[in-house]
UniProtKB/Swiss-Prot annotation:
Domain called tr-type G: residue spans: 8-290
Pfam families from the UniProt entry: EFG_C (PF00679), EFG_III (PF14492), EFG_IV (PF03764), GTP_EFTU (PF00009), GTP_EFTU_D2 (PF03144)
Key words, A-Z: Cytoplasm, Elongation factor, GTP-binding, Nucleotide-binding, Protein biosynthesis
Protein family (similarity comment): Belongs to the TRAFAC class translation factor GTPase superfamily. Classic translation factor GTPase family. EF-G/EF-2 subfamily.
Identification of the protein by name: Elongation factor G
TM spans (from-to): none
Entry's Gene Ontology BP terms: ribosome disassembly
SUPFAM superfamilies named in the record: EF-G C-terminal domain-like, P-loop containing nucleoside triphosphate hydrolases, Ribosomal protein S5 domain 2-like, Translation proteins
Compartments (UniProt record): Cytoplasm
């Protein structure tokens, strides 16, 4: 099958934003203008096309990144047809993982900001993720028709809070209820959209007199940004004081793709103004799969290899998301980086070393699907029939193995125990939790060995609430949920040397393992590190992996209260063996005993998860909010003024103190304050807290 759309005309983009910046509405409008949706879905009615899980429609927030394909030829139909693969990403901080995994497979992103709220805490998180994956960005300032809308304030906030380099390519005509259109700084024309046609029709007019000077000032800034792309452009700009339309676009495009600038647009998606110009900017300024460096990975021999975005290359794709579909079962969303994948073919999961057969291939439009025979380089599609794949693994041509860089998922910080209500629910719950954990790598399931309870862990209360809710709706499992528990950790403060000896003499063959280890604190975040410093074979080579294994098996249960031990370095430096009685198991036991004894002597401490909390509150309630945060052992790290007499408080608070905060904040501020929180780091718990936690576990 020949390509319908050349790869240069592909745009794989994400629409990303803070909750309530109007992201889903913006995506809806994109689908409307590109002709996919005939009736615009409104989030207010719970009818948006991209928010297709029931919980999303009820809560009016987007949880899963739905992937959609649509086509655009430009506002004036002046471009050849471009193919957009759009990933809608959630804005709630508990679903940061969803944003992270979509950033990994995007070539560009549109950041949507609210013209009133501006750059909010979640926007900063998303911005960091986009920077981490070097994703070129455009910014769209939405809700220009709202009370308090201020485009230029958002430009300043982007510089201050995100350390961004925003370059407006349009400026608004009017604001709040007087917002009527935009001045296009590239064409130096005013654009007015026709409300009766839901923004399908528009016309160019002269720039209103009172805006002429402002428009010229901002055009000057845009020209400078474009001219900095190359010496040639800079010289032309300095000589002529201007650049042609084509050269402005070329200069801005080059610098946007290099992540040096972020072109800015504005509008109101709800009132059908401005989104159309943003779509043109996606074509003009964001990269196609061939404009970005080839994707890098390693082959079977751990040698670096690259794959270009080309159909003639060997097939390589990244599975970036799993979803359970009520009709076809498990869907695996893949981003194809190189080559072609046909339905019915066998591919290699290079991470697990297993081959799998691709059943059907579906192109998704939110939750509607169209079956296709093959998927080409640069595309995003969903495969049916893959059983072993989990998020972040590579699928490739079995004749040319490659492992693409994996995604790193955060460790969960909150646990709850779940118990099925009936015996019949027991088995169904196991299947349901297994499916949900395969879909979402930041969600873990385990069985507590002592109590036999099933423990689920995630990134926040809302995260777990929604997963329990999905268990009920999608799998018909009724479960009772316990109170949330904090994921504490244990660490040590001083180095110690310790002997471990496991000797068992009984008739016949005995057991003998003997080691000396040095246990010392490791850098924060480094985790466990094992160093083999054995000289002269005092512990034979073949037993050293057993020592490492014995140590690793002891890590999940610390000596203070049985919490996992983190950030330790263990050096095996001496020991002895017995020709007949030594075996792997004996050395494993000796290492485990040495570790436990060493840990007790190494000043063990309890670590608790600290959360970065951002509260937005009316000034009148500032005292209550601050007092409450200090009462929760919070450390206030900064305050900012926000528009409309609001204040922003940033604090670091232990997770243990944050349960039920939403309800408390509501009553403190009569429901007028909002907050967001995300995991920051682990830090040593105060003595009184540690003692209470340890006594509780006994």
């Amino acid at each position: 099958m020949a390509r319908k759309t050349p790869i240069e005309r592909y745009r794989n983009i994400g629409i990303s934003a803070h909750i309530d910046a109007g992201k889903t509405t913006t995506t809806e409008r994109i689908l409307f203008y590109t002709g996919v949706n005939h009736k615009i879905g409104e989030v207010h009615d719970g009818a948006a096309t991209m928010d297709w899980m029931e919980q999303e429609q009820e809560r009016g927030i987007t949880i899963t990144s739905a992937a959609t394909t649509c086509f655009w030829k430009g506002m004036e139909m002046s471009f050849p047809e471009h193919r957009f693969n759009i990933i809608d990403t959630p804005g709630h901080v508990d679903f940061t993982i969803e944003v992270e995994r979509s950033m990994r497979v995007l070539d560009g992103a549109c950041m949507v900001y609210c013209a009133v709220g501006g750059v909010q805490p979640q926007s900063e998180t998303v911005w960091r993720q986009a920077t981490k994956y070097k994703v070129p960005r455009l910014a769209f300032v939405n809700k220009m028709d709202r009370q308090g809308a201020n485009f230029f304030k958002v430009v300043e906030q982007m510089k201050l809070r995100l350390k961004a380099n925003p370059v407006p390519i349009v400026i608004p005509i009017g604001a709040e209820e007087n917002f009527v259109g935009v001045v296009d700084l590239v064409r130096m024309k005013a654009i007015y959209w026709d409300e009766a046609s839901q923004g399908m029709k528009f016309d160019y007019r002269e720039i209103p007199g009172e805006l002429q000077a402002t428009a010229e000032e901002w055009r000057e800034k845009m020209l400078e940004a474009a001219a900095e792309a190359s010496e040639e452009l800079m010289n032309e700009y300095l000589e002529n004081g201007d650049l042609s339309h084509e050269k402005i676009v070329a200069g801005l495009r080059q610098r946007t793709i290099a992540c040096e600038i972020q072109p800015m647009l504005c509008g109101t998606a709800f009132k059908n103004k401005g989104v159309q110009r943003m779509l043109d900017a996606v074509i003009e300024l964001l990269p196609s799969p061939v404009d970005i460096p080839p994707v890098a990975g390693i082959d079977d021999y751990e040698k670096p290899v690259e794959r270009r975005a080309d159909d003639s290359e060997k097939f390589a794709a990244l599975a970036f998301k799993l979803m359970t579909d009520p009709f076809v079962g498990q869907l695996t969303f893949v981003r194809v980086y190189s080559g072609v994948l046909k339905s019915g073919e066998t591919v290699l999961n290079s991470v697990k070393g297993k081959k799998e057969r691709i059943g059907r291939i579906l192109q998704m439009h939110a939750n509607e699907r169209q079956e296709i025979k093959e998927v080409l380089a640069g595309d995003i599609a969903a495969c049916v029939g893959l059983k072993e794949v989990t998020t972040g693994e590579t699928l490739c041509d079995p004749s040319a193995p490659i492992i693409l860089e994996r995604m790193v998922f955060p460790e969960p910080v909150i646990h709850v125990a779940v118990e099925p209500k009936t015996k019949a629910d027991q088995e169904k719950m196991g299947i349901a939790l297994g499916r949900l954990a395969a879909e979402d790598p930041s969600f873990r399931v385990r069985t507590d060995e002592e109590s036999g309870q099933t423990i689920i862990s995630g990134m926040g209360e809302l995260h777990l609430e929604i997963l329990v809710d999905r268990m009920k709706r999608e799998f018909n499992v009724e479960a009772t949920v316990g109170a949330p528990q904090v994921a504490y950790r244990e660490a040590i403060r001083k180095p110690v040397e310790q002997e471990g000896k496991f000797v068992k003499q009984s008739g016949g063959r005995g057991q003998f393992g003997h080691v000396w280890i040095k246990l010392e604190p490791n850098e924060t975040g480094k985790g466990y590190e094992f160093i083999d410093a054995i000289k002269g074979g005092v512990v034979p080579r073949e037993y050293i992996p057993a020592v490492d294994k014995g140590l690793q098996e002891t890590l999940p249960n610390g000596v203070l209260a049985g919490f996992p031990v983190v950030d330790v370095k263990v050096t095996l430096f001496d020991g002895s063996y017995h020709d007949v009685d030594s075996n792997e198991n004996a050395f494993k036991m000796a290492a485990s005993m040495a570790f436990k004894d060493a840990m007790r002597k190494a000043s063990p401490v309890l670590l608790e998860p600290m959360m970065a909390v951002v509260v937005e509150t009316p000034e009148d309630y500032m005292g209550n909010v601050m007092g409450d945060l200090s009462g929760r052992r919070g450390i206030v790290q900064g305050m900012d003024d926000l528009p409309g007499g609001m204040k922003e408080v940033k604090a670091e608070v232990p997770l243990a103190e944050m349960f039920g905060y939403a309800t408390q904040l509501r009553s403190l501020t009569q429901g007028r304050a909002t907050y967001s929180m995300e995991f920051k780091h682990y830090s040593e718990a105060p003595k009184s807290v540690a003692e209470a936690v340890i006594n509780n576990r006994k």
